[in-house]
């Protein structure tokens, strides 16, 4: 009889986004999404955080493809209104999608997209 091993505990997933300018990306996330600027390493890598969410940035090199992330929002209306008031680039407005989620899309200055949603 085989015995299943329990997995060791791991922490949260931290996305690393490709950006054209790390410091500019940090400032953009601070100003339009209310993240706090974290560390910066020689202009090549850096981080921001908000609550339990952290994002790393790395200066992009070809070939480049933007990243997509799904972000659950407990209060989707408040999140939408907050980000809209901050001037976030909302490329798809808040609406109920055919697949049942209420969601909206924010695109950052480097084309990375965030699908904010609530079930």
Write out the residue ranges for each language-model feature.
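Vicinal oxygen chelate
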Residues: 22, 69-113
